[in-house]
Regions:
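Short beta-strand-to-turn element immediately C-terminal to the catalytic PLP-Schiff-base lysine
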Residues: 57-59, 79-82, 308-309
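Acidic active-site catalytic centers that drive phospho-/nucleotidyl reactions
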Residues: 44-45, 72
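Domain-length cofactor-binding catalytic modules of enzymes
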Residues: 2-28, 35-42, 48-54, 62-66, ...
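A generic, well-ordered mixed alpha/beta core segment in the N-terminal half of proteins
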Residues: 66-116
């Protein structure tokens, strides 16, 4: 465990395996005055992200930086245990390729009569959002069939809110930037006017004001925050988009289960890019781990996932890591991992997705499962390790 100190706050990092870029991103966050009262905890799977660290948890009150949640609002996992013990894997692969749009693809028509986006405040392409329900997306999103030690099969789906999350996040981050820029300029203009009047230089006021309007806010654009009504609107939209992401995972699962003729025994969802609006805890690449709460932590496409139960540890912000965490960026992975090594690592797992285009998601680009298991003992109990028998990623 490490402690990192910034100008306004301190963060606990629950791992020693952290690179300099990630440390720099954490410290930059700690140097922002608006998070001086936040409780910040960084998860063991942490790594540098676009504008913020993946694996961040922090308490919030009346201000929040939308970038800290990011663009895939509500992204998470759905785990479904099915009654069947023997599955036709080629048929499953065909069903997924036929009925679950992946990559940038969406459904031609909505799969249901949806209305949950009617009250969304942020502008968004609602028609596209509804057609996206039941679609996987790309990147590290996946569909997997895993087996536990008792021979039970688990359908595991990892995806989020698709393009809708991007639209909402972008809207509020731009709004945050504009609000802070306007606030900064307003404060400076008041001070300059008073100063110039006191010095009898009123003729310089207009020119000085015009120059000030070109200034950037004192906070980096990627870390600008919303407050006031914009904060309330963001939290409101956050809840709606999180529901949208949950629906997306559920529709994918229901489609597969119906086409395969399976039967559901149990299911649960674990979200990892969101704000817990009840307890005001922001989680970016981390999950809720309250006392007795069931959760799933995916490791990689070879080693499967951990099914855990939370311990409700307040020092961890009642949180756990959302995965193993990358040790190679996508570009580094394509240079460091060969296709033969990738194929060898996936022996025994049925997948039509092991190819050059998915090397950046190969098992070798993530931290070892053993490291994550060791580091999470204080926040969860591991109940099961479920191992892949089938894996699908967009390709």
């Amino acid at each position: 465990m490490l402690e990192l100190n910034g100008k306004y706050n301190t963060a606990k990092v629950f791992t020693d395996n952290i690179d300099n870029e990630t440390i720099s991103q954490v410290i930059e966050l700690l140097n922002q005055d608006y998070i001086k009262d936040a409780k910040i905890r960084i998860m063991p799977d942490c790594h540098a992200g676009t504008g913020c660290v993946i694996g961040t948890t922090m308490t919030i009150s009346d201000k929040v930086c939308p970038n800290l949640v990011g663009v895939d609002i509500g992204c998470g996992m759905l785990a479904v245990r099915i009654a069947e013990k023997d599955v036709d894997l080629p048929k499953l692969d065909d069903v997924i390729n036929t009925y679950v749009p992946a990559g940038f693809n969406v459904n031609d028509e909505p799969l249901g009569n949806f209305s949950h986006l009617n009250d969304l405040v942020a502008p968004a392409n609602i028609s596209l959002a509804y057609c996206s329900i039941g679609s996987l997306g790309g990147g590290n999103h996946f569909i997997e069939l895993d087996k536990d030690d008792d021979g039970n099969l688990w359908l595991v789906i990892h995806t989020g809110s698709r393009h809708l999350g991007l639209e909402v996040a972008k809207h509020y981050q731009e709004l945050a930037y504009k609000q802070l820029k306007d606030l900064d300029v307003c404060d400076k203009i008041k001070a300059v006017i008073a100063d110039l009047k006191a010095k009898g230089r009123e003729k310089e006021i207009e020119k000085t004001i015009n120059a000030l309007k070109m200034h950037e806010p004192h906070i980096p654009k990627s870390l600008c925050y919303v407050s006031g009504q914009a904060f309330k609107d963001y939290i409101h939209d956050m809840e709606i988009v999180q529901k949208h992401a949950e629906l997306n995972r559920k529709y994918i699962a229901d489609t597969i289960i119906e086409k395969m003729g399976w039967h559901i025994c149990e299911e649960f969802q674990t979200i990892h890019n969101y704000i817990d609006t009840k307890n005001l805890i922001l989680r970016k690449g981390s999950v809720s781990a309250r006392d007795g709460e069931k959760l799933i932590i995916p490791i990689n496409m070879r080693d499967g996932s951990l099914i855990c139960v939370g311990k409700g540890n307040p020092d961890w912000n009642y949180s756990a890591p959302h995965g193993a965490g990358r040790i190679l960026s996508r570009s580094e992975a394509k240079d460091a991992v060969g296709i033969d090594e990738f194929r060898e690592s996936m022996k025994g797992i049925y997948s039509s997705s092991v190819m050059e285009s998915t090397i950046d998601e190969s098992p070798m680009v993530y931290k070892p499962m053993e490291e994550i298991m060791e580091n999470i003992k204080d926040t969860v109990d591991i109940v099961k390790v479920i191992k892949p028998v089938y894996n699908f990623k967009a390709h």
